[in-house]
Structures are given as C-alpha cells and as structure tokens.
C-alpha cells in the first residue's frame, strides 16, 4: 500500500472510529468483544483499502466485514455463551431512563439469531434502507423484510414476556431515592 493510502486509512480510522465502535457494539453484546470485532475488521479492511475505489462506501464495507467476522466467531464457538449482567457504557448525556431503556434493548437483542440481529441493527440503528441492508448482508430485499418482520415479532414477544410492571416499580423507587 502506498504511503498516501496509509495516511488516508489512518485519517479515516481517526474520524470514524467512534461511529464504527457503536456499530460493533450493536452487533455483539459484550463491549470488549465489540472492540475486538472492530479491531479485526479494521485489520482486514487495511489489507484491502486500496481496493475500495469509492472511499465514501468504506463504512458500508467495514460494517460488512464486521458482520462477516461476527458470523465467523459465532460459527466457531459451540454456543457456550454465558449470560452476564455487564452492560455497555452509556454516553455521559444519557438520562437514567434512557440508559435503562438502552440496556434493556441491548439485552433483548441477544434473543435474536445473528442474521436477525444484523438486519435490525442495520435497518433501525444504522438507518439503512431495505435495499442497502440487502446489499450489505448479501440477501434479497424480500428476505430483509421477512427477516425484519420475524425479528421484530420476536422482540415484541420477549418484551411482553418480561415483567415490565416490575421495571416501572424499580424506576419509581430510583426516582424516590434520588429525590
């Protein structure tokens, strides 16, 4: 890779690393795994940086690499996932309620299959169109729509199965303690 392309890649990483880390954290539940996922994707992308003709598409390319890498990891392990109470850090300006909602969403996303989680993340968090999501995941637009429909139905079921009244009582208790 030419020196100019190395500098261009370094600048790209410097300016986009926060957004890319957020994308990685939406793909895997553990913050450390998200950092590993992003690092692996950056290493793989670095080797092919000169092959990306339109650098405006670098984010989409990197997301695709992250999704593929996450899928490789998922296939490699024998589903020995151990539930954990550790949740991703929230940004400083998040209110307590927003933090709790984000934590709940991150936890609920764990019930989805990797393909479903990828579709939900790209469509709803990354704000990609159906066609963009289909291209990024290598599937048809119809498959994206049906996968999203099933994933959202599964998320609704999971939300309904949880005791949301208990969560509301906990929130009221926290507010009383804070007052």
UniProtKB/Swiss-Prot annotation:
GO terms for biological process: DNA-templated transcription initiation; response to stress. The keyword DNA-binding applies. It holds the Pfam family Sigma70_r4_2. Sigma factors are initiation factors that promote the attachment of RNA polymerase to specific initiation sites and are then released. This sigma factor is required for normal cell wall integrity; it is recruited by RNA polymerase to transcribe genes with cell wall-related functions. Belongs to the sigma-70 factor family. ECF subfamily. Gene3D superfamilies: 1.10.1740.10, Winged helix-like DNA-binding domain superfamily/Winged helix DNA-binding domain. One of its GO terms (molecular function) is DNA binding. Its main location: cytoplasm. This is RNA polymerase sigma-E factor. Keywords: Cytoplasm, DNA-binding, Sigma factor, Transcription, Transcription regulation. One of its GO terms (cellular component) is cytoplasm. It is found in: Cytoplasm. PROSITE patterns: SIGMA70_ECF. Coiled coil: none annotated. It comes from the Bacteria. CDD domains: Sigma70_r4. Residues 130-149 bind DNA. InterPro entries: RNA_pol_sigma-70-like, RNA_pol_sigma-70_dom, RNA_pol_sigma-E_actinobac, RNA_pol_sigma70_ECF_CS, RNA_pol_sigma70_r2, RNA_pol_sigma70_r4_t2, RNA_pol_sigma_r2, RNA_pol_sigma_r3/r4-like. A motif (Polymerase core binding) lies at residues 36-49.
């Amino acid at each position: 890779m030419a020196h100019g392309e190395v500098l261009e890649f370094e600048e790209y990483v410097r300016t986009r690393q926060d957004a890319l880390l957020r994308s990685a954290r939406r793909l895997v539940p553990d913050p450390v795994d998200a950092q590993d996922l992003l690092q692996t994707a950056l290493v793989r992308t670095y080797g092919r940086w000169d092959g990306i003709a339109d650098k405006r598409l670098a984010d989409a390319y990197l997301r695709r690499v992250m999704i593929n890498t996450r899928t490789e990891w998922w296939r490699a392990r024998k589903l020995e996932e151990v539930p954990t109470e550790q949740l991703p850090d929230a940004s400083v300006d998040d209110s307590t309620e927003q933090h709790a909602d984000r934590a709940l969403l991150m936890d609920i996303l764990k019930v989805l299959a990797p393909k479903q989680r990828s579709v939900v993340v790209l469509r709803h968090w990354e704000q990609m169109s159906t066609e963009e999501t289909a291209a990024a995941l290598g599937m048809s637009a119809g498959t994206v729509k049906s996968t999203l429909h099933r994933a959202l139905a599964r998320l609704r079921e999971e939300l309904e199965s949880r005791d949301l009244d208990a969560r509301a009582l906990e929130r009221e208790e926290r507010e009383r303690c804070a007052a």
